[in-house]
Each structure stands twice: as structure tokens, then as C-alpha cells.
A protein has these predicted regions:
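Generic detector of ordered secondary-structure context
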Residues: 1, 12-13, 25, 69
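Short beta-strands within extracellular/lumenal beta-sheet-rich domains
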Residues: 1-11, 59-62
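A carbohydrate-recognition surface predominantly in extracellular/luminal proteins
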Residues: 7, 20-22
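Extended extracellular/luminal ectodomain segments enriched in beta-structured repeat modules
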Residues: 11-19, 28
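Aromatic- and Gly/Pro-enriched, solvent-exposed loop/edge beta-strand patches characteristic
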Residues: 24-115
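Cross-kingdom TIR/SEFIR domain
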Residues: 117-119
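Low-complexity, Pro/Thr/Ser/Gly/Ala-rich linker/spacer regions in secreted
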Residues: 127-130
């Protein structure tokens, strides 16, 4: 909990983000999901986020508060758990970033003082094509 956790993803064509889905293995507290643009090799500016919600075990899909058109490129799917009890399904590949952040609305820009790591969670965006 109290960590803003990001994983890098690539969008191959223009699309509008509708929702974000995250797999919860162990429930606990609330969760917020978001997407940031890319800045160098790290998350940059917040593009969209969900409202805070109480997740259930398994897949949790939440609409973003404002659907957003995205161009092809690199983005970061980001999640913010309220506490350390909540656990996702973790893999040991991929590019990840994380840092301490108090639960609430996601910051407008991701901190440049992050820890880099190798991981990915079961986490995806649902998109609509133009």
C-alpha cells in the first residue's frame, strides 16, 4: 500500500481508452487505476484514471473517469493500492517503476524519484478504435 506502481505497455495504433482491468489475487482496502504517458524511460503525465473502488478477487474492470484518445506509443499502466494486503498476479518480466505515495487521487505527474524494477502484473486497458 501507499506505493504508486507502474508497468510499461506499448500501443500499436490510435485508440480511445475506455476502462482499465486489474487482477486481484488477495483483496484488501481500495484500489485506483490509471494510465500515464511516457517521459524518457519512465511514466510522465497522468492521462486518465478510475475512481477509487473496493476490488473483488479476480478481474476488476473500472471505467476511466474521462475516455481519452491515445496515439501509438509507450504508456504506463499504474495502480495505487490502499494497503499492503491487496496483491495482484505478478510476473518477473517487463519494465516497472514504483515509489511511495499516499492513497488518493493520482498525481498529475509521476515522480522522477522512483525505483526501477523488472515485473508485470495482470493488468490491461480496454480500447475502442477510431
Amino acid at each position: 500500500g501507499n506505493r504508486l506502481i507502474a508497468q510499461q505497455v506499448t500501443l500499436s495504433q490510435s485508440a480511445t481508452i475506455q476502462s482499465l482491468s486489474y487482477y486481484v489475487a488477495t483483496t484488501g482496502g481500495q484500489l485506483r487505476l490509471g494510465i500515464y504517458n511516457n517521459s524518457g524511460s519512465a511514466p510522465g503525465a497522468l492521462m486518465a484514471q478510475t475512481a477509487a473502488f473496493t476490488p473483488v478477487a479476480g478481474w476488476n474492470t473500472q471505467a476511466v473517469t474521462t475516455p481519452l484518445s491515445l496515439s501509438p506509443g509507450t504508456y504506463w499502466l499504474v495502480f495505487l493500492p490502499q494497503n499492503n494486503t491487496l496483491a495482484g498476479r505478478l510476473g518477473q518480466s517487463g519494465i516497472g517503476r514504483h515509489y511511495s505515495y499516499t492513497f488518493g487521487a493520482m498525481p498529475s505527474t509521476y515522480s522522477t524519484s522512483y525505483t526501477g524494477d523488472t515485473f508485470h502484473f495482470s493488468f490491461y486497458a480496454t480500447l475502442s478504435l477510431p
